[in-house]
Amino acid sequence: MNKQHLFILLTFTVMIVGLLFTQPNRSTIPYYKNLDSSVQYVGDEECAACHADIYNSFIRTGMGRSFYPAGNAEAIEDFKNNAPIYDANNNFYYKTSLQEGNIVQTEYRINAAGEKIHELNRRADYVMGSGNHNRTYVTVQNGFVKELPLTWYVDKKKWDLSPGYHTTNMRFFRPIVEECMHCHNSFTDFEPNSQNKYNTPLPHGIGCERCHGPGRLHVQSRIDNKNELKGNIDYTIVNPKHLPFQEQLDVCQQCHLQGEISVFQPDKRSTDFRPGIQLRSVKSIFMEKNQKPNEFRIASHAERLAKSMCFQGSSSLTCITCHNPHVPVQEHSRRSFNDNCLACHDPKTLIVEDIENHKKDSDCVKCHMTQGGTADIPHVNFTDHKIQIPKIIQKTAVSISGRIYNAPIELVNFFTKEKSPNAIQTGIAYVRYFESRHQHKDYLIKAIAMLKESLQKNDHQIAGWYHLGRAYQLTGDLKNAESAYYQTIAQDPNHTLAFAQLGVLALADERLRQAPSSFRRSINNYPYNPVVWNNYGHALLFSDSTNAALAAYTMAISLDPDYANAFNNRGELLLYKQSEVSKGKNDFLSCLALDPDHIFALHNMSNIALLEEDLENAERFALQALTINSDFVPAYGTLATVFQRQGRLDEAKRVLSRIIKLDKNNADARKILDSLRD
């Protein structure tokens, strides 16, 4: 064998040995018996029976205090010296108070004379957040869990709008979706076809099994006095410290790796992750490719740590290297953190200019892991988990208004980076990003291209077809949207959302026979979606099934009494189809109590005032509608009628001219204007 062949052989051998060390065989990873899907969860009380000391310590941590009934919360908020919070974008004031032992949040509006013209109250049923940094409050109505608009920010000791509300104020109606609840609480009985419906009561905080996996097998083995130990490992329950590097990281990353958007693998949801498996087998987490170097979110610990040279140069640095999850972080001594750094960075061997700050009693974290505001949560002081050299750290300014979107961003899968990206998952991510974050059409164009090409190669992708339908629908291509939804249903005949979207498309296209049947199929698969019931009411009404439409609107309201649109729609049916003026008026008032800026309810109230010859209120409601949309033609029509009846003919002419300018084909306005000129 010549030297060249020997060199190639040796090189190849070294490569194989290297691969054996860097890519461990998955079959060598210990298998924990509680990974089996048949093993059930038992709850923290079972754990506490044997592990009382650990349990009593854990319930004092941020995770152990992540979600709890509002009545059980130790008062740390200031309910007396709290000035109202004003949302100038929407002209609402907010205030939190204690009323008969309940935490109540109030929304109100005042007019130019200082008179209160709107008020809405909601009781906080649960607190979300440990109080280490903030407390946010949620209310539960018929199982629908919704966020309240004010948060107590502990670091600044102040009330302010809840995270995200400075940009988009969803008032009392922001849904707490499953993925959000999953990382703030233990395992819930969530209704999968809903957006935010849970079977109550809800658990009280993140529990032991979130990090250790389901405990039934472990508990039963102890009851049966079975010795499952092999060496130091009990394979009936996961202890994260015995997991391989990536699986150990993933236990924490299930919640501490936020990203921009997550997309679940086919047939997976949050609860399918169990400690001991890889997180990427359950979901893909997408990041912004070109994000600002030192901008971080409140749940970006893993992402930021992964950018650290300490992490990149180590095969053993994980979250629990520095954190004991059973002990409140405030009880970790500064020395304990320093010792972890000194295990690799002995001061004697450091080549540094600043010797004074690199003694054994120095504070490594203070200099190398700076604290500051986050990009998504206002008024907090949080530790950046990217370990850096102080001289190169450049803090990014943080706005309480959250991110200001300009040009579209590029998303990249955290786990795969740009290597072999899953185009279907990425396409879904762009559609969801458009719907939830940034309404820029380029996301939809990119998603359609990705999904079309990938689905031609692998068409058995239910979520891929559904989101392709959504992308087409959102771009106005209703024909291709319908085709994609039918592909979705071909693969999942019980896909309630696809049937609901087919109903919406049929309504838009005035296919009045098809629309009701599509909504019925959706309701048959899942009967608790108020939006589908409301749309079903539309379809029935347009098909002249008035009584059935009335029942559908009523069902929507019974499911969600906060559903302003359903009140308005039922009111219109009662007023215009059944001449039930009083009942219609009550529904419009209920709508306006929930949404004082509901332009159609305001218009309907002005019409009722006209019927009752109450010209003053007819004018008032019409003018109020025009403050919301100055081009709202129906309100000008009401004003023209009011002015004409009052003999204010010049004003009537001006308003009619405005109508014609906005709607050149409005023959009625032209006819009335011509008659007034004569």
Predicted regions and their residues:
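Primarily the internal scaffold of c-type cytochrome electron-transfer domains
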Residues: 25-31, 38, 53-128, 136-141, ...
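Residue-level recognition of tetratricopeptide repeat
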Residues: 428, 470, 504, 538, ...
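Structural marker of alpha-solenoid helical repeat scaffolds
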Residues: 457, 491, 525-526, 559, ...
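Helix-start (N-cap) detector for alpha-helical repeat units in TPR-like alpha-solenoids
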Residues: 462-463, 496-497, 530-531, 564-565, ...
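Terminal, low-structured helical/coil segments at or just beyond the last alpha-helical repeat
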Residues: 611, 637-641, 645-678
